[in-house]
UniProtKB/Swiss-Prot annotation:
Residues 40-49 have a biased composition (Basic residues). Residues 1-74, 91-132 are annotated as: Disordered. The modification Phosphothreonine is found at residue 24. One of its GO terms (cellular component) is cytoplasm. The keyword Membrane does not apply. Residues 96-132 have a biased composition (Acidic residues). This is Sugar utilization regulatory protein IMP2. GO terms for molecular function: transcription coactivator activity.
Length: 346
């Protein structure tokens, strides 16, 4: 078949100006035929895409089932190590499923791990779970408060229980002389600082640079942190700095004296509790108002270079949230006693 362009001459005759030879005949394709052909092509592409998606989904489902089985095994192994009181065994956890899959699926596993990052829980979250706590408490055949810290001659529970009657007798003995050794100073900007040095025996040894800083908010958990610090971390001849930050400027000096008195009575009680092990010790009680308590702590750490900064977990979650310093932080948490009621946890 030829395609040509006709040129009409003045005499009325026509001649071929240009012609193109076509090897295949051309056919006219209507709209309905074009639509039908497009549907067939799209159907084939959808079928191929569906097969590919089904393969990927089956692979992801198998991978998710394998990861879920591994997570269940890890949770059971974690609970087993906690109940056997051997947390070091968690360092040897091996993922058997990942070894069986081989090295060929490392890239696919990396993609799958990215999706499971939000679902995974840390060891602390699993141990601190309510169900786990109940199961762990059932397996423990002794009270954690019955432990005896190195500097105490009695258990923690006995130290805490003896505080109220001992402090009551101590307050009677110093009645009328509560503020004798407390120094109160007015600082620039209208800020106030109250300080008292409490010495046991000969005090801190000359040349002994070991010291600790305890940041307290006068709560019961902070008192427990002080008890743990005095019973487990302090050595002979050390110095302990107890820092309390008063958030509001007091209208009179009685508030600052009261803050020092609340800390002093617990320190004196702990002096009596550690008398069988520690003879010489210094404790500096400090209560003050300051615009930037975190900056104050960093300056004290830079100047005193303590062994560690000790505080309660409630302080870490409130006042010292996002706090960073150059020394280790010892966060002490007082686990509250739960009343076991039948039928509630079942």
């Amino acid at each position: 078949m030829q395609k040509s362009i006709l040129l009409t001459k003045p005499d009325g005759t026509q001649s071929n100006l240009h012609s193109i030879k076509t090897e295949t005949p051309t056919t006219v394709e209507f709209d309905s035929e074009q639509m039908e052909r497009g549907h067939r092509e799209r159907g084939r592409s959808k079928k191929k895409r569906g097969e590919r998606d089904s393969n990927v989904s089956s692979l992801s489902r198998s991978r998710s089932r394998a990861s879920s089985r591994s997570r269940v095994r890890e949770e059971e192994f974690l609970k087993w190590t906690v109940l056997r009181q051997d947390p070091s065994m968690r360092l040897r956890v091996v993922d058997v499923d990942s070894e069986e899959e081989g090295e060929g699926n490392d890239e696919d596993d990396d993609d799958g791990d990215g999706d499971d990052m939000d679902e995974e829980e840390s060891d602390e979250e699993q141990v601190s779970d309510i169900e786990n706590d109940l199961e762990i408490d059932e397996e423990f055949h002794y009270d954690l408060g019955m432990k005896v810290l190195p500097n105490f001659c009695t258990s923690i529970n006995e130290v805490l229980d003896s505080s109220k009657p001992w402090i009551a007798k101590y307050e009677i003995s110093i009645r009328g002389h509560e503020n004798e050794d407390v120094s109160l100073e007015q600082l620039d900007g209208g800020y106030v600082r109250a300080m008292q040095l409490l010495t046991k025996g000969a005090g801190a040894e000359a040349g002994n640079q070991r010291s600790f800083i305890l940041y307290t908010d006068l709560s019961s958990e902070s008192t427990y942190a002080l008890t743990y610090l005095m019973g487990a971390a302090v050595n002979q001849g050390d110095t302990v700095y107890i820092v309390h930050w008063e958030p509001s400027k007091p209208t009179d000096d009685s508030q600052m004296f009261a803050n020092v008195a609340r800390i002093r009575k617990h320190v004196m009680h702990l002096f009596d509790c550690v008398a069988g092990v520690l003879d010489d010790l210094d404790v500096v009680v400090l209560s003050l108002t300051h615009p930037y308590p975190k900056h104050l702590l960093n300056e004290m750490i830079h100047g005193l270079k303590p062994v560690a900064l000790c505080c309660s977990l409630s302080v870490i979650l409130s006042t010292l949230q996002n706090f960073v310093c150059s020394v280790p932080i010892l966060a002490v948490r007082k686990k509250l006693k739960r009343a076991k009621r039948k039928g509630i946890s079942e």
